[in-house]
């Protein structure tokens, strides 16, 4: 290992908080709020890669986290459309070299961006990337959180939300939670709505293509593309705590200073565009494509609910 690259990172962090109280129905009502926001971008400013080949990890001007991939213009509606496509794009072997019978109805329709009649990676450099382009970035465009709470008449409530702005993730071929039988023919996990989500002549507007085993581990789905690149931004209801402290006069006769009954919930709900395409991958556990081990079958954040009582003597 060597320190062979120069990196420039620019970003910001913001934090705002407010706490106050006023009288409500003759009793003090206290409330508080806190919000945080941060963002950063990192670029390579110096690296020994004069041709800017993708064969090396970095190149000058590279933004860390950029995702290069192919553009997909939907699925072929008929075998005839697929045949017409292959008469215009003559060499599709980089994409469909392992597909028996070539492109058929229900397969992905890749766009020949450079118009040379060949679907591929060109010279595999930034200047000649073939039919690839930057589709997104794997690092969050921003990270934020906010807390809201109040206390009144012995009740106290606090809620914490946490989330990120847009960032993107392409599922690894071994991620059966996302791909199901597109990973392996002997897959042990099949989504309950799989039949409704995959292409067939009766379901031409499906999100997933015609079923082909191993297409995510070596076929057309293994090529990073715009159709299955996932925006994994999210907003998570991270914590809710509701408590009630018994009035002191109730406790005087039993020699107890304080009794508080409470409920705490963790990871109660989340909002994310990923839910539209897959209910079985948690956006917070969707790592970058290079983290193969974490990409395969990551556990989701568990929802927990707990009731308790605090007694102070």
What are these regions, as identified by a protein language model?
Residues 2-8, 12, 21-136, 178, ...:
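Conserved small-residue
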Residues 6-12, 37-43, 139-144, 163-165, ...:
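Transmembrane beta-barrel architecture of outer-membrane proteins
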Residues 16, 33-35, 159, 261-263, ...:
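Membrane-embedded beta-strand positions of outer-membrane beta-barrel proteins
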Residues 20, 37-43, 152-154, 163-167, ...:
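Transmembrane beta-strands of outer-membrane beta-barrel pores
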Residues 165-260, 265:
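Extracytoplasmic gating/loop element in the C-terminal half of outer-membrane beta-barrel translocons
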């Amino acid at each position: 290992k060597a320190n062979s690259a120069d990196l420039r990172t620019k970003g910001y962090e913001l934090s705002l908080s407010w706490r106050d109280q006023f009288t409500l129905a003759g009793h003090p009502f206290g409330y508080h709020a806190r919000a945080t926001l941060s963002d950063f971008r990192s670029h390579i400013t110096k690296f020994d890669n004069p041709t800017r080949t993708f064969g090396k990890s970095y190149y000058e001007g590279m933004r860390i986290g950029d995702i290069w991939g192919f553009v997909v213009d939907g699925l072929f509606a008929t075998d005839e459309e697929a045949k017409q496509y292959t008469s215009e794009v003559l060499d599709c072997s980089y994409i469909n070299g392992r597909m028996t019978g070539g492109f058929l109805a229900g397969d992905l329709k890749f766009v020949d961006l450079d118009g040379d009649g060949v679907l591929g990676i060109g010279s595999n450099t930034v200047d000649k990337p073939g039919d690839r382009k930057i589709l997104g970035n794997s690092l969050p465009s921003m990270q934020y959180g906010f807390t809201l709470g109040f206390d009144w008449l012995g009740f106290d409530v606090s809620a914490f939300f946490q989330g990120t702005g847009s960032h993107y993730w392409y599922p690894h071929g071994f991620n059966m939670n996302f791909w199901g039988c597109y990973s392996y023919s002997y897959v042990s996990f099949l989504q309950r709505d799989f039949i409704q989500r995959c292409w067939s002549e009766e379901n031409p507007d499906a999100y997933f293509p015609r079923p082909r085993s191993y297409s995510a581990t070596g076929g057309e789905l293994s090529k990073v593309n715009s159709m299955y690149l996932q925006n994994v931004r999210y907003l998570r209801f991270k914590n809710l705590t509701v408590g009630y402290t018994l009035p002191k006069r109730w406790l005087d006769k039993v020699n107890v200073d304080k009794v508080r009954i409470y409920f705490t919930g963790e990871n109660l709900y989340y909002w994310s565009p990923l839910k539209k395409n897959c209910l079985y991958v948690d956006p917070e556990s969707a790592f970058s494509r290079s983290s193969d081990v974490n990409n395969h079958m990551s556990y989701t954040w568990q929802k927990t609910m707990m009731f308790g009582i605090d007694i102070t003597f």
